[in-house]
Amino acid sequence: MTQLLKPSDYITMPWKNGQGSTAQIHLVPESAQFPQDEFLWRISSAQVSGENQFSQFPGYDRWLSVWQGAGLLLNEQKLEAFAPRLFAGETPIHCQPLSSDVIDLGAIFRRGQVTAQMTAEHLSSQQSRSFTLAPGSHYFFCAQGHLAIETLSANSGSTLHIDVPSEDRLDAATKAKTQYEIKNKLVLRNPGIQETRFFHIYLRKISVSEISS
């Protein structure tokens, strides 16, 4: 499944501790109610306009990066733009923005049930790049410029979301028909004249066999 998520699709809601607001990009499972229900992962973006304390999420881990503005001070340590950082959700964090226009991007995911990675990427004008997508959920968040895949195009602030099924969920006929290995190769393009900067967030549920081993 491939879908384009625009800022108009995001759900704006207060932080868990009430000290700010965030735009929820995607919550899994979608039937969960944040923050009262347990969830597997949540992708969101928030404008940080003043000092605050981060909401705490015991049992979860978090990826965080800045995609607009000068960065953040997290417990007196600088988080620069496009430099994702991983930390435990229960860690007390005092946050201070280094400019008035800071906007972050975050992924919160259930420890022991989900693995996650966040990387900052870029494409020069008219450049294309091939990605091999592992089974799981992939989010390509466009922070600057334009990002295109097949017939879909994301502008700044929009997200391309791709779910890749695991091979064991496909029968033999489907694997042969769709050429599973080839299908998982994705080409991202920058159709614009300016550099594109984006984030790739990859999340995968940990299998029962991995948990028990």
Task: Please report, for each region that a protein language model flagged, where it lies by residue.
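Jelly-roll (double-stranded beta-helix
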Residues: 1-213
